[in-house]
């Protein structure tokens, strides 16, 4: 279920919760949960490896430029990879607002009626964004406000039954993101989120 639902905007966590309830399965072991998150990271890395590689290189260049003055670099718009790194950092910030409520939100996953209702909400969000959303914004034209709002949508998607990818893609399209960029940004934005969640589980 995790493998099929993770890359579809249908809330893998919501479906896992319902699967546990209807089949009377015990709570997922913490180690197994960590492995599921790690597998998700690997899958995103495989699909977007070129983007990730460019951003990692640019991230270390950014760090290096704080200590070493770069000669020959002209002022102006930053490279696309550098801009994407900055957008992902900004988009991840709203997650810190929901951290204090993590246990309470996780408890909602044990209520099948609530989870089912959130799955319906996800469906409505996807329908509306597909019908009315979309624009021409890309990584070069997306604003700070845009990515922060997408980050807020990602924070809201910690609620069981709300699809993280579906919610962030829909938010991006509602803000005028071009469809392909909305999908790409959503999955790249999942990397720091899933990595952070995995580290929290380990700790």
Where do the protein language model's features map onto the residues?
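Multi-pass membrane proteins that catalyze or facilitate reactions on polyprenyl-/lipid-phosphate substrates
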Residues: 1-203
């Amino acid at each position: 279920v995790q493998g099929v639902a993770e890359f579809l905007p249908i809330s893998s966590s919501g479906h896992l919760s319902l699967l546990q309830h209807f089949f009377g399965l015990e709570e997922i072991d913490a180690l197994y949960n960590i492995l599921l998150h790690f597998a998700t990271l690997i899958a995103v890395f495989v699909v977007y490896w070129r983007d990730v590689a460019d951003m990692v290189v640019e991230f270390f260049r950014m760090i290096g430029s704080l200590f070493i003055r770069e000669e020959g670099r002209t002022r102006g718009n930053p490279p696309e990879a550098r801009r994407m790194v900055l957008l992902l950092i900004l988009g991840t910030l709203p997650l810190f607002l929901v951290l204090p409520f993590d246990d309470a939100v996780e408890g909602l996953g044990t209520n099948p009626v609530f989870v089912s209702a959130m799955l319906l909400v996800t469906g409505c969000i996807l329908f509306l964004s597909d019908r009315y959303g979309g624009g021409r914004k890309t990584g070069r034209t997306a604003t700070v406000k845009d990515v922060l709002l997408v980050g807020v949508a990602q924070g809201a998607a910690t609620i069981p039954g709300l699809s993280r990818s579906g919610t962030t893609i829909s938010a991006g399209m509602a803000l005028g993101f071009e469809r392909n960029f909305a999908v790409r940004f959503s999955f790249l934005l999942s990397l720091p989120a899933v990595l952070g969640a995995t580290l929290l589980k380990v700790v």
